Amino acid sequence: MAMATRVLAQSTPPSLACYQRNVPSRGSGRSRRSVKMMCSQLQVSGLRMQGFMGLRGNNALDTLGKSRQDFHSKVRQAMNVPKGKASRFTVKAMFERFTEKAIKVIMLAQEEARRLGHNFVGTEQILLGLIGEGTGIAAKVLKSMGINLKDARVEVEKIIGRGSGFVAVEIPFTPRAKRVLELSLEEARQLGHNYIGSEHLLLGLLREGEGVAARVLENLGADPSNIRTQVIRMVGENNEVTANVGGGSSSNKMPTLEEYGTNLTKLAEEGKLDPVVGRQPQIERVVQILGRRTKNNPCLIGEPGVGKTAIAEGLAQRIASGDVPETIEGKKVITLDMGLLVAGTKYRGEFEERLKKLMEEIRQSDEIILFIDEVHTLIGAGAAEGAIDAANILKPALARGELQCIGATTLDEYRKHIEKDPALERRFQPVKVPEPTVDETIQILKGLRERYEIHHKLRYTDESLVAAAQLSYQYISDRFLPDKAIDLIDEAGSRVRLRHAQVPEEARELEKELRQITKEKNEAVRGQDFEKAGTLRDREIELRAEVSAIQAKGKEMSKAESETGEEGPMVTESDIQHIVSSWTGIPVEKVSTDESDRLLKMEETLHKRIIGQDEAVKAISRAIRRARVGLKNPNRPIASFIFSGPTGVGKSELAKALAAYYFGSEEAMIRLDMSEFMERHTVSKLIGSPPGYVGYTEGGQLTEAVRRRPYTVVLFDEIEKAHPDVFNMMLQILEDGRLTDSKGRTVDFKNTLLIMTSNVGSSVIEKGGRRIGFDLDYDEKDSSYNRIKSLVTEELKQYFRPEFLNRLDEMIVFRQLTKLEVKEIADILLKEVFERLKKKEIELQVTERFKERVVDEGYNPSYGARPLRRAIMRLLEDSMAEKMLAREIKEGDSVIVDVDAEGNVTVLNGGSGTPTTSLEEQEDSLPVA
């Protein structure tokens, strides 16, 4: 591109890009004319051209490397232009006025010259460049006349032939081509344009009329006068479209406002705005403020999604229908696009000029109400070094009442930006827009129903609208009504529509076969196997007919449904529930038969993994069933328990088993080891670090986990190890199901199951709760458990505050494990070892004697099942590891583990007559500890 610029500069005619002066010739009285071309004399060290684009408002030589001086000053220095009148002459005409498309035309013309082997660029190459550019007005007009690049190239070669000489790197322009460039500038001036586009080059080419290009057009049957007419007509249409950006009228009274704004009142008259339901107090307050003499600028403040923009649209609809006071009757509500206003302002003062023009048009019109959505974007908009931003430019007009402006912004942005500038804040009158209630949201949805039914081509039931409002309020906590409810019905409509629009499975299979047949047919034709191609073509025709018949049948069925009164697909309550579930992961759909069976058999399933502890398993199962059928308190967590008891009896394991069974996997559980929160300063890790501290941007371990997965089990393991401040923070979680994190966001805990484990009271349980005297309770086991429970509860009251314990749903005391229960757990743990060895293709069997030995060594009522795991590790896993390393046991072996008469563990490779306990005889269950 650098080379193209240099050639263009050298070839530019004198009237365009050079300075001429008469210099007296030595030895004579006559003067001779000296012509200094722009780039031929421009040899400035350090001046390196890097780009050739963006000419409409920028220099053609986009980036001048290694030079800080202005490009035009370099040109003047190279041309030795004296000060005075001539020094004001610049070379803007060519380089600053060429559009990108015009530059592309010149570059393509040079490429065409190289292709033809010519060492010049003439009018014919410019014509080929105009056709080859493809997207400009000139290319479109020539294409509409039936002129294409291929035919034009043929005609050019016929007339001038191909060159055989050496083509220089820098290809000069012919005098006639220079004349075309000169005429294109004149054409641009006549049309009132301050740029040269491809259309002006074409007009210059036609006006020149005597070059090879004119003969080419004549040979191709094109009428120059007709081409000229078409170009001027298209230029006029483009100008009209540009003037009407933003939907304004074609009358050019307010060009700036129409370019950067959208007329909401006109859209309301055309019925293109959604109906606004309710919000009467806010609209009346806005009208009231607009009627003031000064500072008549309402600012709508509310949370995102509550309907601030809708209030401006509601005002436009009222004005369109005439239902407004005479103070604002006949006015236009125009929303300003700040992004469009700032876009393309490359030079200092350009943005301010646009804004001043805009304000002047509003001031002169006196019938404009300006609506600026996200009004906080005014602050800092357009500000550069030494410039002032949009807010400061607008301040005087806002205060004097010359400009009626409605702003809209969120509470956070209002606090961050507008409240920081008291001078701007006093010019806007705040109008609070509260979140609508569920009932108001239902009315809004009913008002919008028709628009969404037309868009999705279906119907919404009343129940679906009620469900959208209620479920979005209950389950989607981080957004606001009515926005989240509207999004629900919109996505549900899209889902139902797509489901009904699916092609039948039969038609899909036929289409797949049809594609394959077509592919094979084309390959057969390429391979000149015409007999096979003919057979495949017949099959292709048959398949097309079958597909058409299936599609026609589907259309007839839908037509018959509509005739019988069925108005297309319906969006029901279950569709809304499905969308809520897919958004949040919370199952809100109705309980299916399979799920009902799972819920009713929950205790039985959990007991496959948890041995004993009936009270805890029943309490957990009851809570899940209550939540799933929708009977739980909607403002509290699903349930909150504290599991207390000795170590190793299955407190944490029960939470893991629940997460694995009901929530899909153990990873679905949020586990917090409270031993990590023993110090006061670690409490902030739960909700996030305060501002100014490391980790503020990362969020809290608890709050972020629940925000991402709102339907889950939260396990606070070893709760008594935590600092007492943790319990204070948990009070609002247990009571109201909510917690505010360090960034001020409210996290919803209403769909979590909270489980806290504790070893408080383990010393009481170890003693067994025995007391002196007679016990009249016949069930000694239950009597002992009840005594232990009351003693543990008393000890919990000593450790935890009453307000904490009072908020828990249930305090469950785990029993000590009996020897029989430990034996069942041993079966589960041994099965784990069998499974691990099976992956290594080693079959393991243990005898009954070995199992008894493991239970004897691993049973300790005070420590639960954990000693059992250690006994298996020591007696079984260590023995197996030694034998495997000694290569006495290899893959594919069958191993029996037994205990001899002296009590030593023996590992036998191969079968023996000893009675064994095989893998198949083990219970199908999983470990407890």
UniProtKB/Swiss-Prot annotation:
Positions that bind ATP: 302-309, 645-652
FT transit peptide: 1-38
Annotated ranges, domain Clp R: 95-237
Gene3D superfamilies: 1.10.8.60, Clp, N-terminal domain (1.10.1780.10), P-loop containing nucleotide triphosphate hydrolases (3.40.50.300), UVR domain (4.10.860.10)
A single GO cellular-component term on record: Tic complex
A Pfam family the protein falls into: AAA_lid_9
Induction: By cold and salt stresses. Not induced by heat stress.
TM annotation in the entry: none
Alphabetized UniProt keyword annotations: ATP-binding, Chaperone, Chloroplast, Membrane, Nucleotide-binding, Plastid, Protein transport, Repeat, Transit peptide, Transport
Acidic residues composition bias: residue spans: 920-929
Stretches for region I: 257-504
Family: Belongs to the ClpA/ClpB family. ClpC subfamily.
Domain notes: The Clp repeat (R) domain is important for membrane association and is essential for the in vivo functions, but not for the ATPase activity.
Name assigned to this protein: Chaperone protein ClpC1, chloroplastic
Native organism: Arabidopsis thaliana (Mouse-ear cress)
Name of the gene: CLPC1
